[in-house]
């Protein structure tokens, strides 16, 4: 076992086949990569366990298949002098089984001529060894098929990366929805409309229960692929231990009571994880079990998770979050419903029309208004970002968002966010020094006609003109949000992620010129001492 071979496999153990008894192999410490990590690649685990077996298998069986060089005159035999793994392709077979294609390059000596004085020439040929591995039953069927390598023989299945996470691009999401429903709930196509999530769960062979999942209710749902003893919480908040069966979804009970649509969404989110990522979590659980078998007791929670591991977790959450609304609202179903709703509300102005359409879609598909709005925007019907926005615990009036505004920019800002930015962003403080802006309807708007008027409740509100021309009167913010997801080996859970969010003023070129002028004019008028400045803020900005 060479140092280069050990270094190429990022796994703490390596199994070397016993050529005297090929059915046996013994593990040894991988001195070049003996560091134990929280997450590993399936391809490294596969090579650590079976690479020597693959190469032995090739050497022993190549003579049965030949080397596809046509008829070789006076052929006597061949011998494999070296084998090299070129590539491993992975495909989903089922929720627990992964297809494995290993492409191996064989360096071969071909013997021809007379047996007493044979001629030898060298040849290089590539082969494909195809099989599958059952991660739930831990059964190896890796050596099912042996064939010369041809790219056109690649499988037409859902392809997986080295960690067993599906390879899905943004452009593949709608097609993936069709695959998901055909694979797990084909009955959906018989009656397009509202997805029966309970029926889907049963069809997928899963079970669902509601219970208390955490003290702080940060965990919305959990999927246990394999049975496990865990801590749950009763109605009064007391903890208790329970044995969870295989393939079980648990939903936070308070979520079911307070927000049934969100509970349905969470259950479907776990179904999406099961359909897409069960192989990943089954394998990582297998890896942890193997660590406990061959190493001293280890605290899995304290093992390091590298950047690639974090990226895989984020990727899986992105896939589940992007796929779930598409499963609940497939593109063709939305198109069909929109053909009915658009003529119904065509007499309204655009953003008020879409406010009504979103409400009807949410009711029809049994989803939240936010999800219905999100799907319409994705499908290109209209920029619905200014419709049904929930700020300061209330829906704010609809407004038009110009097409040039990026997805990361917004006119909306909560009072709490505004206070945070006010403390840290000098540009905002300079703008507010002008006294020309008012905080109204979740926006910072110019406090002047034709943008602000007094409503029937004697409070200020944005005018219809302001709602149609937001870039003229309202400050534009850019928001950045970084999500950090929890990772527990072998468990899929929908956890409210830890969020790091900041917002800062951006604005269109015209706004920036106007704000710069305001700032210059106002700085001349500002008080010079701290006490007067505080009084100035209270009097002019209402903060």
Model-derived segments and spans:
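Divalent metal-coordination and catalytic microenvironments
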Residues: 201, 320, 372
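Charged, glycine/proline-rich intrinsically disordered loops and linkers
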Residues: 219-243, 287-303, 411-417, 422
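Post-HEXXH active-site segment of zinc metalloproteases
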Residues: 261, 265, 276-311, 340
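Contiguous, non-catalytic segments that form substrate-binding/exosite surfaces or channel walls
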Residues: 101-239
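Active-site scaffold of zinc-dependent metalloenzymes
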Residues: 209-267, 271-284
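Short helix/loop segments within enzyme catalytic domains
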Residues: 308-349
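Hydrophobic (often cysteine-bearing) scaffold residues that line and stabilize catalytic clefts
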Residues: 173, 193, 264, 268, ...
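Pan-zinc metallopeptidase signature
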Residues: 5, 11-20, 28-92, 97, ...
């Amino acid at each position: 076992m060479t140092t280069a071979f050990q270094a190429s496999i990022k796994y703490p153990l390596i199994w070397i086949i016993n050529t005297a008894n090929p059915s046996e192999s013994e593990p040894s410490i991988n001195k070049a990569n003996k560091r134990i990590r929280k997450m590993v690649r399936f391809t490294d685990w596969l090579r650590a366990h079976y690479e020597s077996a693959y190469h032995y298998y090739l050497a022993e069986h190549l003579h049965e298949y030949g080397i596809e060089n046509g008829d070789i005159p006076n052929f006597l035999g061949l011998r494999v002098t070296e084998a090299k793994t070129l590539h491993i392709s992975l495909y989903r077979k089922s929720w627990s089984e992964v297809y494995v294609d290993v492409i191996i390059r064989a360096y071969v000596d071909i013997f021809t001529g007379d047996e007493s004085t044979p001629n030898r020439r060298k040849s290089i040929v590539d082969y494909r060894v195809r099989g599958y591995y059952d991660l739930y039953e831990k059964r190896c069927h890796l050596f099912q098929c042996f064939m010369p390598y041809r790219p056109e023989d690649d499988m037409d299945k859902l392809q997986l990366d080295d960690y067993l996470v599906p390879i899905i691009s943004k452009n593949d999401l709608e097609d993936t929805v069709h695959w998901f429903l055909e694979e797990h709930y084909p009955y959906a196509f018989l009656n397009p409309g509202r997805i029966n999530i309970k029926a889907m769960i049963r069809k997928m062979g899963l079970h669902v229960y509601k219970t208390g999942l955490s003290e702080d209710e940060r965990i919305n749902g959990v999927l246990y692929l394999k049975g496990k003893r865990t801590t749950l919480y009763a109605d009064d908040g007391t903890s208790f231990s329970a044995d969870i069966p295989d393939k079980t979804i648990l939903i936070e009970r308070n979520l079911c009571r307070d927000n049934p649509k969100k509970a349905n969404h969470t259950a479907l989110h776990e179904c999406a994880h099961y359909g897409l990522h069960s192989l990943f979590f089954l394998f990582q659980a297998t890896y942890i079990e193997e660590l406990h078998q061959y190493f001293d007791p280890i605290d899995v929670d304290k093992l390091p998770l590298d950047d690639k591991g974090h990226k895989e977790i984020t990727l899986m959450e992105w896939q589940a979050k992007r796929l779930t609304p598409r499963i609940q609202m497939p593109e063709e179903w939305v198109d069909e419903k929109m053909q009915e709703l658009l003529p119904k509300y065509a007499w309204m102005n655009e953003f008020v029309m879409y406010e009504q359409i979103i409400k009807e879609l949410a009711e029809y598909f049994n989803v939240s208004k936010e999800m219905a709005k999100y799907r319409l925007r994705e499908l290109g019907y209209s920029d619905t970002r200014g419709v049904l926005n929930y700020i300061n615990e209330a829906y704010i009036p609809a407004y038009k968002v110009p097409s040039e505004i990026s997805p990361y920019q917004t006119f909306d800002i909560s009072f709490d966010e505004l206070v945070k930015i006010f403390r840290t962003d000098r540009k905002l403080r300079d703008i507010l020094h002008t006294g020309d802006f008012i905080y109204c309807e979740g926006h910072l708007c110019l406090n002047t006609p034709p943008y602000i008027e007094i409503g029937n409740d004697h409070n200020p509100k944005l005018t219809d003109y302001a709602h149609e021309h937001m870039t003229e009167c309202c400050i534009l913010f850019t928001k950045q949000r970084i999500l950090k997801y929890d990772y527990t080996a072998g468990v899929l859970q929908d956890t409210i992620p830890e969020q790091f969010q900041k917002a800062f003023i951006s604005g269109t070129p015209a706004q920036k010129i106007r704000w710069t002028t305001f700032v210059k004019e106002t700085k001349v008028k500002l008080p010079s001492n701290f006490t007067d400045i505080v009084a100035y803020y209270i009097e002019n900005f209402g903060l």
